[in-house]
A protein has these predicted regions:
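Short amphipathic alpha-helix that is part of the acyltransferase structural core
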Residues: 1-32, 49, 146, 155-204
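Small/polar loops that bind or transfer phosphate-bearing groups
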Residues: 9, 105-106
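A short helix-loop-beta-strand connector motif used in the catalytic cores of GNAT acetyltransferases and
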Residues: 37-51, 69, 142-145
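A short, compositionally biased micro-patch
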Residues: 41, 63, 107-109
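Conserved beta-strand in the GNAT
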Residues: 47, 53-62, 66-74
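Conserved acetyl-CoA-binding loop-helix of GNAT-fold acetyltransferases
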Residues: 75, 81-98, 106
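Conserved active-site alpha-helix within GNAT-family acetyltransferase domains
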Residues: 102, 108-140
Length: 204
């Protein structure tokens, strides 16, 4: 495969990112995004580019001063299986660590991909920032089919079983025994540079 490069998104990438998302909505694994929303947050994205075309993208979306989310992670179906998705997540994790976030989270139908990168599956309620920011307004809030996964980003941060052994979510009891996970030592590549937006408070 021709060399793939990873870089920070720009407003000019918004139409290509929008097409990627729209072309993959039928999978049921992505939430729709408006072109205006993508334009507003274009510099939060890392895009993968091959021969001048955007073939994959992912957004580092702040949920609070300490927690960021992997959002709108999508790889064009014609180039899947080439480790582009894992590379995007690694780039986001490195950028999140460089910006001082303590935790990177994702809500996904395919948690195994994230577990391979060091994430831990946790009950949804262990990511209250996401619940407050997005989930309570979602029509599937009480019957969500996604898994919550988290990755500690700060040096010295460990995931320990200090949370409750189980929580109630969506009317069912969810086992909640976390594993100890050492922080991944990720080096930022510079693909995603800080933006003015990163310094503003994120509303609940």
């Amino acid at each position: 495969m021709t060399m793939v490069t990873f870089r920070q998104g720009t407003e000019a990438d918004a139409p290509a990112v929008n097409r990627l998302i729209e072309d993959n909505l039928q999978s049921g694994h992505l939430l729709p995004r408006t072109i205006d929303e993508i334009l507003e947050h274009a510099r939060r994205f890392i895009v993968a580019e091959r021969d001048g075309a955007v073939i994959a993208c992912a957004e580092l979306a702040p949920l609070s001063a300490t927690v960021a989310e992997v959002r709108s992670l999508v790889v064009d179906e014609h180039v899947r299986g080439n480790q582009i998705g894992p590379r995007l997540v690694t780039e986001l994790a490195a950028a999140g660590a460089a910006r001082g976030f303590a935790t990177l989270c994702a809500f996904t139908h395919q948690p195994s991909h994230f577990v391979k990168l060091g994430f831990t599956i946790v009950p949804h309620m262990w990511v209250p920032e996401k619940i407050a920011h997005d989930c309570t307004s979602c029509p599937l809030f009480r019957r969500c089919g996604q898994y919550a996964v988290t990755l500690p980003l700060r040096v010295g941060v460990h995931v320990r079983p200090e949370q409750p052994a189980a929580v109630i979510y969506g009317g069912r009891t969810v086992g909640a025994r976390r594993r100890n996970v050492e922080r991944l030592h990720l080096q930022p590549s510079g693909a995603l540079a800080p933006t003015e937006e990163d310094t503003r408070a994120v509303p609940a």
